[in-house]
A protein has these predicted regions:
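Bacterial Sec-dependent N-terminal signal peptides
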Residues: 1-23
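N-terminal beta-rich core of secreted/periplasmic extracellular enzymes
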Residues: 20-176
């Protein structure tokens, strides 16, 4: 009986150790493997593909099919490097994000301008206070928590970059 229990413990501990292995490309501190991976992709690109990687195109997740098809064509034939999402809905955006990534030979950089959260661009999402309001708060810990939550929300829908915060000059009283 003791041998059976010992064998089971050994089996379960082996499975637990193997389950903790990970992809080195997904580990933030494994820069060398990441550099090698990027280098291997880049060295196999044509000049046209390298130039295409410099461009990001804007699309609304609520755009008509024709516009989405044009972006798909740019991904497949001009090898664009990324997408900047604008207005639309979260469900449609995640679907488009997945469709676009599946079409691209190289992972696309997905971006959005969401200064005060996803609600700045997407319907039915949580809105945070605008930057002018945040600037009036004296407790930096609150500001940090809000920024962290906005980052978590944008990451959850597949964004790599949030073009925020920005420095705006407030000269238009109709747009504070």
């Amino acid at each position: 009986m003791k041998k059976s229990i010992a064998a089971l413990l050994l089996l379960f501990s082996s499975v637990a150790v193997l389950a903790q292995q990970f992809n080195p490309l997904l580990v933030q501190n494994d820069r060398e493997n990441q550099r090698v991976w990027v280098g291997s992709i880049y060295s196999n690109m044509s000049l046209q593909e390298k130039v295409g990687q410099l461009f990001m195109v804007d699309i609304y997740s609520s755009d008509p099919k024709e516009k989405k098809d044009k972006v798909k064509d740019l991904i497949q034939n001009q090898y664009i490097g990324g997408i900047i999402f604008s207005k639309g809905g979260p469900k449609q955006q995640v679907q488009l994000n997945n469709e676009f990534q599946a079409l691209s030979r190289t992972p696309l950089i997905m971006a959005m301008d969401a200064e005060w959260g996803l609600a700045m661009r997407l319907d039915s999402t949580f809105a945070y206070p605008w930057n002018m309001t945040l600037g009036a708060i004296s407790d930096n810990k609150i500001i940090q928590k809000i920024g962290k939550r906005i980052g978590e929300h944008t990451k959850r829908i597949g964004m790599h970059i949030n073009f925020a915060p920005v420095v705006d000059i407030n000269i238009n009283p109709a747009n504070p």
